[in-house]
Amino acid sequence: MAQHTFLVEIGTAELPPKALRSLAEAFADNLKSELTKADLAFGDVEWFASPRRLALKVSELAGEQPSKSVEKRGPAVAQAFDAEGKPTKAAEGWARGNGITVEQAERLVTDKGEWLVHTAKVEGRPAKDLLGELVSQALAKLPIPKMMRWGDKTIQFVRPVFTVTLLLDGELVPAHILGIDSARTLRGHRFMGESEFTIDNASQYPQILQERGMVIADFMARKVKIKADAEAAAAAFGGVADLDDALLEEVTALVEWPVVLTANFEEKFLAVPAEALVHTMKGDQKYFPVYDKNGKLLPKFIFVTNIESKDPSQIISGNEKVVRPRLSDAEFFFKTDLKQTLASRLPRLETVLFQQQLGTVKAKVERIETVAGFIAERIGADVAQAKRAGLLSKCDLMTNMVGEFTDTQGVMGMHYARHDGEDEAVAVALNEQYMPRFAGDALPSGLVACAVALADKFDTLAGIFGIGMLPKGDKDPFALRRAAIGALRIMTEKQLDLDLVELVEEAVRVYGDKLTNKTVVTDVVDFMLGRFRAAYQDEGIGADVVLAVLARRPTRPLDFDRRVKAVSHFRSLDAALALAAANKRVSNILAKVEGELPTAVKPELLVDAAEKALATQVAELQAELAPLFAAGDYQAALTRLAALREPVDTFFNEVMVMADDEALKANRLALLNNLRNLFLQVADISLLQ
């Protein structure tokens, strides 16, 4: 069967840059799905995306659907013929509908009876007759949160559509999509190249667009070019460009013909904290800051323009003029803020609401102060510094800088605290209290910062859960999931041996009588343990491993982490699944015992060699493993317990647990109970699969 190249390009008004890549990828995925459902074989599907187009190029596309044999069952033979053997009206109607006579029908015999049947060959439809509808379906399923209408049309799409191109090799595929008839027209760059031109063959895409329209349609090609050119531009003056990937993606989505240029700003602005300048350059202007080899911000920036100019100096000058007022604002805010200390801003936090039922931000920082001190005592941090940092933690919200540039909260608090002469650990904690801000982000560096970060997160968790506002589905306005995962990461990765129950109880205590949920402590702890499960599964650790540990409900995250890693290692041992099955068997046996389970094994009641051997090993391991359990060395303990595989297998092969003799039965149940309790010191390994 001949294979073809299919092109679809949707020419639009400027598409939202932050959604461009996801739209193109979803378009490709959707078309693959539609082609598969239509039974049209295909090879690769390449996606292209620029500010004014979404395009797909399908290689090795089948020219038509494969022909199929379809069995069409008719009436049962008993109903197909009357008493004289003549076809009934039902049989004749069915045959006529299938283009045959009753005599031409075949017979299908099953164990339920005999039916008339006709095997029809259904010819596959040509791809060109299907592609228009398949593209329409793929576009209709794009994840577009907000649609637009344009002109006098009722049609909706993410942005107005101006051209639709569908080519199967060199043949134009007739279609009417989003109110536009398909044509060979492509639109080039707004200001360079040919504004409009026609394409003869799908194989010419995207090269023809680049050569005649001066548009690089390949998103990844533009991104690679911008990155390489920006790195080279920075290296030319000994600098290193801050090529933040999220910003790089956004800039890639803003241009069709990227040209990288370098500009400057006045050195006097370097007196302002670099974070504020960087926020202005990256967040507002989409510029790439440049640092020297030591990480110090340079008075330069790199930007990407969408045009090749005969006089780039004009574009450079224009961008310098645009950024200067923004940097001047930052300088003004910084100098003004320095006229007041952070501590002097504390009373004004009374005017900012944290949550209606939970009170103001001032009340929140007072709670953070107390809980941070509580945590500091337990992790060996300076209590006075932790409490001071907790009290000042939100004061920078009342500064001009943070009021204008909200993303600088925390980091500006650090700079202002340093200016005020606060201890360095306090200043650093003001910045690091929000860490980790996202998955994979850095953690607070020092113990004081850890105490404040944890106190802030537990205050939010206890408060919001305490008034019954649990996160539901995707709705999590107070970022409780992020707070829980962040707190767990701090405790495990910074090796802080804290108990969740103790921390939540303290966070609840300082709220006084504001909280109405009587089960808030249990709710928060369960919620956090649930976040643990999701986090480990993201790391590739099996759900059964985490469930085995969760069954024991250890509430010290550091201890929980050690157990998970130990069980994960144990699961890789040859003996693991056999011992897991044995534990499940033991669990089932013990579950049927009424009353209290026996624990004392009487040596004189050990009759069979197999139970004597198992009892000896269990007793020896109880003594040997006690210090390992106490030290939290669960991996070593489980590795030793793996040696029980053979004696356990032999025991179940040779010993009847539920003996007629009640004394023997009780003794054997005690032995199994002791065996199971050894494993339960770590996890319920009967849940391993």
From Swiss-Prot:
Reaction(s) the record says it catalyses: tRNA(Gly) + glycine + ATP = glycyl-tRNA(Gly) + AMP + diphosphate
Statement: the UniProt record of this protein carries the keyword Signal: no
One GO term describing the cellular component: cytosol
Gene Ontology molecular function, alphabetical: arginine-tRNA ligase activity; ATP binding; glycine-tRNA ligase activity
Record's subcellular location: Cytoplasm
UniProt cross-references to Pfam families, sorted A to Z: DALR_1 (PF05746), tRNA_synt_2f (PF02092)
Keyword Repeat: no
EC number assigned by the record: 6.1.1.14
The protein's enzyme class: ligase
Family, as annotated: Belongs to the class-II aminoacyl-tRNA synthetase family.
Subunit structure: Tetramer of two alpha and two beta subunits.
Designated name of the protein: Glycine--tRNA ligase beta subunit
